[in-house]
Amino acid sequence: MSDLKAAALRALKLMDLTTLNDNDTDEAVIALCKNAKTAVGNTAAVCIYPRFIPIAKKTLREQGTPEVRIATVTNFPHGNDDIEIAVAETKAAVAYGADEVDVVFPYRALIAGDETTGFELVKQCKEACGDVLLKVIIETGELKEEALIKKASQICIEAGANFIKTSTGKVPVNATPEYARMMLEVIRDMDVAKTVGFKPAGGVRTAEDAQAYLAMADDILGGDWADNMHYRFGASSLLTNLLNTLEVTEETADPSAY
């Protein structure tokens, strides 16, 4: 297997296959869940709006892939600084049955010099999550500066985040390798690689992109770090590209073909 194919297979199993469109329907979410099951393995998770959690859970169970995790979003996409609302949304997501919650950090508050709101929001959302995984979206493309990106990452980690995530995918600039490096360096420098993961989201579209991101993680945190409890790709169109790279066609995907 070529290096690119090996990276594509690895990336596929680290994907949070995502649909977060305003016009999402039950049908779109059912289709997403079906796509999470491929001939070469399942994606790590699907990522959907909270109201679709019950239909996703049912679909994943009925197709025999209950191990695919369900991630959802809160305080999304604007990262407002109302802690009470963010916590209420997070509690509701957990009650719906989410396995993972991706909450948006109040990044504008941090830009304005307020570090406390972000810390409290993440801390209280983590308390609301209990054992449910909390990923915190810092919106790198809006923070822009290395000092702010690193500060946001540190605050999230200190407040109990299980993952730090680049972006909502709803702003002009989302994940970039440069931003990813800054965030991975914080995980390394704070010595929290065992307990904190990383998720680039938005802009990771090809097997080559995924290969470069994984190579960076291997370089900074070691070759065995980026497993599915420490690394995820937030993406939608990436899956098709990975399957094409792996030369998986509809025929190979048909179980009756075996």
Curated annotation (Swiss-Prot):
- Compartment list: Cytoplasm
Q: Which residues constitute the catalytic centre?
A: D102 (proton donor/acceptor), K165 (schiff-base intermediate with acetaldehyde), K199 (proton donor/acceptor)
What start and end residues bound the annotated signal peptide? none
Q: Which GO terms describe its biological process?
A: 2-deoxyribose 1-phosphate catabolic process; carbohydrate catabolic process; deoxyribonucleotide catabolic process
- InterPro entries, alphabetically? Aldolase_TIM (IPR013785), DeoC (IPR011343), DeoC/FbaB/LacD_aldolase (IPR002915), DeoC_typeII (IPR023649)
A GO molecular-function descriptor: deoxyribose-phosphate aldolase activity
Q: Which UniProt keywords apply?
A: Cytoplasm, Lyase, Schiff base
Cite the SMART domains for this sequence: DeoC
Q: What is its EC number?
A: 4.1.2.4
> Where is this chain primarily localised?
cytoplasm
Substrates-to-products reaction catalysed? 2-deoxy-D-ribose 5-phosphate = D-glyceraldehyde 3-phosphate + acetaldehyde
Query: Pfam families under this entry?
Result: DeoC
Q: Which domain of life is it from?
A: Bacteria
Q: Give the enzyme class.
A: lyase
GO cellular component term, pick one: cytoplasm
Name the pathway it acts in: Carbohydrate degradation; 2-deoxy-D-ribose 1-phosphate degradation; D-glyceraldehyde 3-phosphate and acetaldehyde from 2-deoxy-alpha-D-ribose 1-phosphate: step 2/2
Under HAMAP family, the record lists:
DeoC_type2
The record's NCBIfam families line, in alphabetical order, gives: deoC
- Function of the molecule: Catalyzes a reversible aldol reaction between acetaldehyde and D-glyceraldehyde 3-phosphate to generate 2-deoxy-D-ribose 5-phosphate.
The family classification in the record reads:
Belongs to the DeoC/FbaB aldolase family. DeoC type 2 subfamily.
Q: Name it.
A: Deoxyribose-phosphate aldolase
